Amino acid sequence: MATSHSLKAETRACGSGNLKQLRSQGLVPGVVYGPGFDNVNIQVDAREFARMLASAVSEHILVALDINGKIVKVLLKEVQHNPITNACLHVDFQAVTDTTVIHSIVPVILEGDSAGVALGGVLDQTIHELAIICQVKDLPEAITADISGLKLGESLRITDLKLPSGVTTELAGDVIVAIVEAPRVSGEEAAPAAEEAVAEK
């Protein structure tokens, strides 16, 4: 089952001047839209919104949005941030139902200590987020993968991921998610090793 967060919102008036005033009052302007849903301009408390994001593992989450006392199930689609302060400037929500099919992006979280890393290998995670397709009711907040069995030179591929029931991805199964690379030998370390190899011949 998908995890749902909760947030309160109020309807707001339109206008760019009004947006600046809202932000100065500690509010974040936003909009709710979706098939069969009349677009609604809203405002949410900036601190409450930031607290909700902090409790999630990504910005692609389900939210039970309380709009003036009416609960609407929404998907957080986009968060616009100030490029300098990183403050939230605007949020977009998509109204959904449990059976709405969505395209979303979720983080890939690696768990466990790789056997190869314990031997001096270097873990290189090449995919940190995964594009998935599923119904809203099946949306995971993250995809986790156990890498404790990865040895030197071994890799974790898309086909190795245990996607939750009802969740698929369009990425090919042989795409590498993470690999344990052998430690690189520096030039200074390689020279003595080469000399020893020659001396043994």
Curated annotation (Swiss-Prot):
Question: What SUPFAM superfamilies has UniProt attached to this entry?
Answer: Ribosomal protein L25-like (SSF50715)
Q: Name one GO molecular function term.
A: 5S rRNA binding
Q: Keyword check for Thylakoid, yes or no.
A: no
> Which Pfam families does UniProt cross-reference here?
Ribosomal_L25p, Ribosomal_TL5_C
Quick one: a GO biological-process term for this protein? translation
User: Per UniProt, which keywords does this protein have?
Assistant: Ribonucleoprotein, Ribosomal protein, RNA-binding, rRNA-binding
- InterPro entries associated with the record: Rbsml_bL25/Gln-tRNA_synth_N, Ribosomal_bL25/Gln-tRNA_synth, Ribosomal_bL25_b-dom, Ribosomal_bL25_C, Ribosomal_bL25_long, Ribosomal_L25_dom, Ribosomal_uL5_bac-type
- CDD domains tied to this protein: Ribosomal_L25_TL5_CTC
Q: Which cysteines are joined by disulfide bonds?
A: none
User: Per the database entry, which stretches of residues form a coiled coil?
Assistant: none
Any GO CC annotation of this UniProt entry: cytosolic large ribosomal subunit
Subunit info here reads: Part of the 50S ribosomal subunit; part of the 5S rRNA/L5/L18/L25 subcomplex. Contacts the 5S rRNA. Binds to the 5S rRNA independently of L5 and L18.
The UniProt similarity line reads: Belongs to the bacterial ribosomal protein bL25 family. CTC subfamily.
| Protein role | This is one of the proteins that binds to the 5S RNA in the ribosome where it forms part of the central protuberance.
What is the recorded name of this protein?
A: Large ribosomal subunit protein bL25
